[in-house]
C-alpha cells in the first residue's frame, strides 16, 4: 500500500500553485527522508507547467508549519558518511526549490523550526502570522548539531552574519514581529488572510532582498568578519567551556561560506553535520530530547485523571507566587491564593504582574492579554472561594504540624474530591497525610525555584495516594508547562537527595583549603551552569542546608556536612544573594549585581584558601558522590526508571546535558571505570565514596543502565 503523501499540489485558477504540507497521522509536520521523492515529483510538475505564476508552501496543521526534521532519521545513521549524505540530499532539494523560475513563498503559521525554517529560507519570500504560536528558529545546536540543509549559508546572507550567528549558536526563537524587523520574513498578517497574502506576494516578482544594516555590511567584509568571529568565538568558548563541539563547527562553517563562497560553505556544512551526528555529545543531547518527550507523554498512572477547572494555592510567598503564575498564565486555570495577610496576596499578584509586564515590554504579549491572564488570579485571607477548587497546592513554611493543619483545613473547607498537593522539599508526604480523612487525595508536588524557569517538578505519592490523584497531578504539571517525574516518598525525594552530597563535598573541600572560585569554576568547566558554592548562595544557604539533617537522619553519616561549618556561616548571618552576603558578597542591584568572593569566609570556617587540587580532581569528587546516590535511588526505586533519573538531574539541577544525565554518563564511562574511581577516592578521602552494591554488581556483570529494563514503582 502506497504511503499517503505529506506534500500535495493544487493549482488555483489564477495559476498559483499551493503545496500543502500535512504529514499523515501526526500532530506535527516533521521532515523525513522519504519525503524528498514526493517534493521532487512536485517540482517536476511545477517546471513542466509553463502557465504558473508562483508557488506557495503552506501547512495544513493548526499550529505548526514544519517543526524540524524527524530526529529518528538522524539517529538511524550508523556513520558520519551516512549523515553527511542525508544533509547533501536535503541541500540539493533546497537548491531545486530555490532554482524554480517563478516566485516561491512560504506561508508560515505556528512553529517553523530547523529544517522547516531552512525550507522557508530556500523560498524567495516568507509571510507569517502574528499569532503567538508562530516562532522561527534553528534549534539544531540544542541537539549538538548544526543546520544541515543550507541554513548556515542562507541565513547570514539574508539577515546579516552577526544576527544569524546569534540565532544559530543559541537556537534563539524569533516571534513574527522580530522576524519582520530583521528581514527574515517579508510580511506579518493575521492568520485569516495568511494564504491570500502569500498568494499576492507570489504574483509579484521575486521579493528583493532588503539592504543589510550598515553594521552588518561592515561585519560582512574581511576585516569586520575577522574581528566578529574572534569575538564571538571567545564569547562562545567562555559560555560552553569547550563542552559543545557543535558551536565551534557552526563558526567554522559560517566563516567558510562567507570567505570562500556558498559552494564551499555547503560542502563544509554537510561534512560538519555528518561528523557532529556521531559525537557522544549529540547522542547524549538527543537522548535527553527523546526522554523528555516520553516523560511528557507519561500519564503517571493507569487511572484517568479527574477534571481540572480551578486551583487554590496556600501561601503567597516566592514559591506560591511562582506557582500561581504558571497555573494561571501557562495552564490557563483560575487560581485563588490564600495567605494569612493581605501583603502575601499582594506579593503573589505582583509576581505575576512583573512576569507579564516584562513580556509586554518585550512585545511578546499584548496589554489586553496580560490583563486577561491576571484576571484569573484572585486572593483571600480565608477560605472563601475555595469550596469547589479541584486541587489545592500548599506552599507554606517547611513545618510538619503547619502542613498537617493545612490538610485538615482544606478537608474542612473544600469539596470531597479536592486534591491536596504539598510543595514540600523535604518532609515525608506520608507524614503530612498522617491525620487526613482522605489520605488518598494527598500528594507531593515539588516545584523548583524560580518556578517560571525551572522545567522539572517531582510528583510524590505516599503509600496511600490513589492512582487518580497521581494522574490528575501529572496532568496539572503538564498544563503548567512542566516536565513531571513521579518519585517515591523517601527523604529528599530524588533531586535534593543526589544534590546534597555534591554540595556537601564542595563545602568539605573548602575546609580542606580549596578556594571558592576554584571549586565553582571546576564544576562549570565540567558542564554545570553554576558551581555548587554559587548554587548554595543563589538558593539561600539557610534554605539549601535545611534538608541536610533530614537526609543524615534517614541515610546516615554519608550525608553529614563538615562539622560546624554550616552553623558558623548561618550564625554570621550569611544567607547568600538574598541578603547580600554568603560565600560571595553581592552589590545592591538584585540578581544582576556582580559578586565577588568574601575573603572573610576562610577564617570563618577555619580554612586557608590555598588549594592543591586540579579542576578535574575537584569535579570528580563532587560528581562521583552524585552518581553513587543516583544509583542508590534506582536500586531503592525512588525513581521509576533511569530515564526519569537522567531527566530529573538535567532539568532539576543542571547536570551537564551533553553527558545525557547521571546514568548515561555512567554508561559512557563504564560501570567498572566508575567503581575504580570511587574506590580510589574512598581510599584517599573516606568511606562515603564506597561504590554502592548495585553499581558493584553491574560492574561485575558488565551491565549498563540504558540496556536494562527500567524499574516501575507501581
UniProtKB/Swiss-Prot annotation:
It catalyses: a (3S)-3-hydroxyacyl-CoA = a (2E)-enoyl-CoA + H2O; a 4-saturated-(3S)-3-hydroxyacyl-CoA = a (3E)-enoyl-CoA + H2O; a (3S)-3-hydroxyacyl-CoA + NAD(+) = a 3-oxoacyl-CoA + NADH + H(+); (3S)-3-hydroxybutanoyl-CoA = (3R)-3-hydroxybutanoyl-CoA. It is found in: Cytoplasm. Pfam families: 3HCDH (PF00725), 3HCDH_N (PF02737), ECH_1 (PF00378). Residues 1-190 are annotated as: Enoyl-CoA hydratase. Transmembrane segments: none annotated. One of its GO terms (cellular component) is cytoplasm. Keywords: Cytoplasm, Fatty acid metabolism, Isomerase, Lipid degradation, Lipid metabolism, Lyase, Multifunctional enzyme, NAD, Oxidoreductase. One of its GO terms (molecular function) is long-chain-3-hydroxyacyl-CoA dehydrogenase activity. InterPro entries: 3-OHacyl-CoA_DH_CS (IPR006180), 3-OHacyl-CoA_DH_NAD-bd (IPR006176), 3HC_DH_C (IPR006108), 6-PGluconate_DH-like_C_sf (IPR008927), ClpP/crotonase-like_dom_sf (IPR029045), Enoyl-CoA_hydra/iso (IPR001753), FA_oxidation_alpha_subunit (IPR050136), FadJ (IPR012802). Gene3D superfamilies: 1.10.1040.50, 2-enoyl-CoA Hydratase, Chain A, domain 1, NAD(P)-binding Rossmann-like Domain. Pathway: Lipid metabolism; fatty acid beta-oxidation. Its EC number is 4.2.1.17, 5.1.2.3, 1.1.1.35. One of its GO terms (biological process) is fatty acid beta-oxidation. The record marks 118, 140 as: Important for catalytic activity. Catalyzes the formation of a hydroxyacyl-CoA by addition of water on enoyl-CoA. Also exhibits 3-hydroxyacyl-CoA epimerase and 3-hydroxyacyl-CoA dehydrogenase activities. Heterotetramer of two alpha chains (FadJ) and two beta chains (FadI). In the N-terminal section; belongs to the enoyl-CoA hydratase/isomerase family. This is Fatty acid oxidation complex subunit alpha. It comes from Shigella dysenteriae serotype 1 (strain Sd197). The gene is fadJ.
Amino acid at each position: 500500500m502506497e504511503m499517503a503523501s505529506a506534500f500535495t499540489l493544487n493549482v488555483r485558477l489564477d495559476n498559483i500553485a499551493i503545496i500543502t504540507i500535512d504529514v499523515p497521522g501526526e500532530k506535527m509536520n516533521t521532515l523525513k527522508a522519504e519525503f524528498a521523492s514526493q517534493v521532487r515529483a512536485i517540482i517536476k510538475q511545477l517546471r513542466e507547467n509553463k502557465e504558473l505564476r508562483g508557488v506557495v508552501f503552506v501547512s495544513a496543521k493548526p499550529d505548526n508549519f514544519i517543526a524540524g526534521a524527524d530526529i529518528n532519521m538522524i539517529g538511524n545513521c550508523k556513520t558520519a558518511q551516512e549523515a553527511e549524505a542525508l544533509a547533501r540530499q536535503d541541500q540539493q532539494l533546497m537548491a531545486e526549490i530555490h532554482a524554480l523560475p517563478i516566485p516561491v513563498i512560504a506561508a508560515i503559521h505556528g512553529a517553523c523550526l530547523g529544517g522547516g525554517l531552512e525550507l522557508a529560507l530556500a523560498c524567495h519570500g516568507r509571510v507569517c502570522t502574528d499569532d503567538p504560536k508562530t516562532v522561527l528558529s534553528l534549534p539544531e545546536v540544542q541537539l549538538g548539531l548544526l543546520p544541515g540543509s543550507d541554513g548556515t549559508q542562507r541565513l547570514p546572507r539574508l539577515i546579516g552574519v552577526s544576527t544569524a550567528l546569534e540565532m544559530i549558536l543559541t537556537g534563539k526563537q524569533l516571534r513574527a514581529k522580530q522576524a519582520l524587523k530583521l528581514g527574515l520574513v517579508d510580511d506579518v498578517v493575521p492568520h485569516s488572510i495568511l494564504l491570500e497574502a502569500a498568494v499576492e506576494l507570489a504574483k509579484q516578482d521575486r521579493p528583493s532582498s532588503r539592504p543589510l544594516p550598515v553594521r552588518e555590511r561592515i561585519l560582512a567584509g574581511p576585516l569586520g568578519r575577522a574581528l566578529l568571529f574572534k569575538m564571538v568565538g571567545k564569547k562562545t568558548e567562555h559560555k560552553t567551556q569547550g563542552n559543545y563541539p557543535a558551536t565551534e563547527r557552526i563558526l567554522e562553517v559560517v566563516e567558510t561560506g562567507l570567505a570562500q563562497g556558498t559552494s564551499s560553505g555547503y560542502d563544509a556544512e554537510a561534512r560538519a553535520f555528518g561528523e557532529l551526528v556521531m559525537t557522544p555529545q549529540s547522542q547524549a543531547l538527543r537522548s535527553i530530547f527523546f526522554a523528555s518527550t516520553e516523560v511528557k507523554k507519561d500519564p503517571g498512572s493507569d487511572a484517568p485523571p479527574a477534571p481540572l477547572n480551578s486551583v487554590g494555592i496556600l501561601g503567597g510567598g516566592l514559591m506560591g507566587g511562582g506557582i500561581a503564575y504558571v497555573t494561571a498564565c501557562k495552564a490557563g486555570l483560575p487560581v485563588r491564593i490564600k495567605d494569612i495577610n493581605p501583603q502575601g496576596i499582594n506579593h503573589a499578584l505582583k509576581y505575576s504582574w512583573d512576569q507579564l509586564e516584562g513580556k509586554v515590554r518585550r512585545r511578546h504579549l499584548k496589554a489586553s492579554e496580560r490583563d486577561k491572564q491576571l484576571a484569573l488570579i484572585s486572593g483571600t485571607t480565608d477560605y472563601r472561594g475555595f469550596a469547589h477548587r479541584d486541587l489545592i497546592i500548599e506552599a507554606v513554611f517547611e513545618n510538619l504540624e503547619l502542613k498537617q493543619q493545612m490538610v485538615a483545613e482544606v478537608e474542612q473547607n473544600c469539596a470531597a474530591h479536592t486534591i491536596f498537593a504539598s510543595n514540600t522539599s523535604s518532609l515525608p508526604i506520608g507524614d503530612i497525610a498522617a491525620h487526613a480523612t482522605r489520605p488518598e487525595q494527598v500528594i507531593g508536588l515539588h516545584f523548583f525555584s524560580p518556578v517560571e524557569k525551572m522545567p522539572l517538578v517531582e510528583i510524590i505519592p505516599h503509600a496511600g495516594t490513589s492512582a487518580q490523584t497521581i494522574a490528575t497531578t501529572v496532568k496539572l504539571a503538564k498544563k503548567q508547562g512542566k516536565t513531571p517525574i513521579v518519585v517515591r516518598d523517601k527523604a529528599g525525594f530524588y533531586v535534593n537527595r543526589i544534590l546534597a552530597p555534591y554540595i556537601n563535598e564542595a563545602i568539605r573541600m573548602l575546609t580542606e583549603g580549596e578556594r571558592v572560585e576554584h571549586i565553582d569554576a571546576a564544576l562549570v568547566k565540567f558542564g554545570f551552569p553554576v558551581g555548587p558554592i554559587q548554587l548554595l548562595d543563589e538558593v539561600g544557604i539557610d534554605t539549601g542546608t535545611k534538608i541536610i539533617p533530614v537526609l543524615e537522619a534517614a541515610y546516615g553519616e554519608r550525608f553529614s556536612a563538615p562539622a560546624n561549618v554550616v552553623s558558623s556561616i548561618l550564625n554570621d548571618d550569611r544567607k547568600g544573594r538574598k541578603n547580600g552576603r554568603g560565600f560571595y558578597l553581592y552589590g545592591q542591584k538584585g540578581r544582576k549585581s556582580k559578586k565577588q568572593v568574601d575573603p572573610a569566609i576562610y577564617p570563618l570556617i577555619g580554612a586557608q584558601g590555598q588549594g592543591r587540587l586540579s579542576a578535574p580532581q575537584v569535579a570528580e569528587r563532587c560528581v562521583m558522590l552524585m552518581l553513587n546516590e543516583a544509583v542508590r535511588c534506582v536500586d531503592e526505586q525512588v525513581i521509576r526508571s533511569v530515564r526519569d533519573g537522567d531527566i530529573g538531574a538535567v532539568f532539576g539541577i543542571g547536570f551537564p546535558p551533553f553527558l545525557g544525565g547521571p546514568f548515561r554518563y555512567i554508561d559512557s564511562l563504564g560501570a567498572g571505570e566508575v567503581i575504580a574511581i570511587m574506590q580510589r577516592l574512598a581510599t584517599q578521602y573516606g568511606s562515603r565514596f564506597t561504590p554502592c552494591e548495585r553499581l558493584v554488581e553491574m560492574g561485575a556483570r558488565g551491565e549498563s543502565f540504558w540496556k536494562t529494563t527500567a524499574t516501575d514503582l507501581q
